Amino acid sequence: MNRILAVIFLSLFTFIPAIAEPLYAGIQIDNDSAGVLFGYPINRTYAIEAHYSKSNSRTEHAGVTVDTSSTGIGIVGIAAFPMKLNDVLPYSLFVKGGYQRTTNTDTCSIPTSATLTVPYDNTITSHKNQVIFGGGAELDLAKNLTGRLGLDFLGNKRSLNLAAIFKF
């Protein structure tokens, strides 16, 4: 029994890195949110990437408070164009396009002093399905570490983002 378990664990330690080799994962921050991304490079030029982002904001005015929580989950296709200049680390320019589903939850709180009756609390949740596209540059900082600077367009919103990506 112990030998069988040893063989299973040894197989897992050799199999998992083999299937994870082309994958990459990273963290991304932009103007008002933070998130994670996971990708699969199809070849040197093309990749498929999934991402998840979350942001929270709070607005207060005249006793009225609105808390907004947004989450986005999406998938994009990426086309990268490797570049090389003299005396500069290798980098790539990329364009991307895809789909994102965004969920916004707004919680409004109005105190008794503003309503002159009882306090008012309400939560509204909305969903949007939107096209996302953008572009930017990636710089290989180390063998398995890449830095990314990009500009994304989601609906009528633009966001400048910065990401650190680890390639397995």
Protein language model annotation of sequence segments:
Residues 133, 137:
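Catalytic phosphate/metal-binding cores of nucleic-acid and nucleotide-processing enzymes, i.e., regions
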Residues 56-57, 140-168:
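Predominantly the C-terminal beta-signal and adjacent terminal strand-loop region
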Residues 21-32, 48-50, 93-97, 144-155:
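Transmembrane beta-strand segments that form the barrel wall of outer-membrane beta-barrel proteins
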Residues 26-36, 87, 127-131, 150-163:
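Solvent-exposed loop/turn segments connecting transmembrane beta-strands
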Residues 1-22:
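Cleavable N-terminal export/targeting peptides
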Residues 35, 39-110, 163-168:
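Gram-negative (and chloroplast) outer-membrane scaffold detector with strong preference
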Residues 106-125:
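Solvent-exposed loop segments that connect transmembrane elements
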